[in-house]
Amino acid sequence: MDAKIMITSPTTWPSPAKLNLFLYINGRTDNGYHELQTLFQFLDHGDQLTITVNDSGHITLTPDIVDLPVEQNLIWKAANALKKKTGCTLGANIHLNKILPMGGGIGGGSSNAATALVALNFLWQLGLSDDELADIGLKLGADVPVFVRGHAAFAEGVGEKLTPAQPEEKWYLVVRPDVHIATVDIFTHPDLTRNTPKRSLETLLDSEYGNDCEKIVRMIHPKVDKQLSWLLQYAPSRLTGTGSCVFAEFNSRSEAESILAQLSDNVSAFVAQGRNISPLKETLADYLSAQNRPI
């Protein structure tokens, strides 16, 4: 991109949620990490980052998040990791419109980090490839590369082997029970299934989807168990990741919204459609197209 047309006005970027449509644990590596097979799909629902580039050399992030110092925020970490990698001397003001629940298993923090990397790579005109951005992202979190690449993906190994996938783009009712689940507590639980046989993506896509973490989470957290039991009355429903969010799948928006309407007002929930191309990827394409438009 020509530096003479650097965008200095605010730009807004989506930071979409994701679901693990299935999650199977196949074993452990020699260094203790769990080997798994999982299918990521994005949702057309999520946070937003509004970014204004400047020449201050500093990253500012608003608003403040309770109990999360800015230096620990993945957005701030991503922006500064990008500066360190490239030697970029520019800065940015980043405003986060936080919609997704924190710690819900739908990728909020990882998605935020990926959006910061993709957006600032464009706005600062750095020219890094998806592979280079994904490498930076992997140091911030295992799920960040999926969001950077922007395609629904089948993940294997410890999550680092990604194969683009095309699952059906269904409608989902996503519900967040009011509990905090520490991923480490689930993956270290003695009763966690760790020996599910590996299967090909084709076989998995044609099979009933499941989540090996779900049994443990339901056992430890009655609120999750109660919410899943309720959803299962209406549609196929599962845990995403290690939770706490659970989701039910439907063939239409109207079906999902009719069940959403039956939830009490104090339950955190939303309806969204699965997307195999991330809204972030689509927004980047729009900005790139606008830059190439004849003036």
Curated annotation (Swiss-Prot):
Pathway in which the depicted protein is active: Isoprenoid biosynthesis; isopentenyl diphosphate biosynthesis via DXP pathway; isopentenyl diphosphate from 1-deoxy-D-xylulose 5-phosphate: step 3/6
GO annotation (BP), single: terpenoid biosynthetic process
Keywords, comma-separated and alphabetical: ATP-binding, Isoprene biosynthesis, Kinase, Nucleotide-binding, Transferase
EC number: 2.7.1.148
Catalysed reactions, as listed in the record: 4-CDP-2-C-methyl-D-erythritol + ATP = 4-CDP-2-C-methyl-D-erythritol 2-phosphate + ADP + H(+)
Coiled coil: none
Catalytic site positions: K18, D143
Keyword ATP-binding listed: yes
GO molecular function: 4-(cytidine 5'-diphospho)-2-C-methyl-D-erythritol kinase activity; ATP binding
Pfam families tied to this protein: GHMP_kinases_C, GHMP_kinases_N
Superkingdom of origin organism: Bacteria
Binding sites annotated in the UniProt record for ATP: P101, M102, G103, G104, G105, I106, G107, G108, G109, S110, S111
Enzymatic class: transferase
Family that this chain belongs to: Belongs to the GHMP kinase family. IspE subfamily.
Function: Catalyzes the phosphorylation of the position 2 hydroxy group of 4-diphosphocytidyl-2C-methyl-D-erythritol.
UniProt protein name: 4-diphosphocytidyl-2-C-methyl-D-erythritol kinase
Source organism (scientific name): Vibrio vulnificus (strain YJ016)
Biological classification of the source: Bacteria, Pseudomonadati, Pseudomonadota, Gammaproteobacteria, Vibrionales
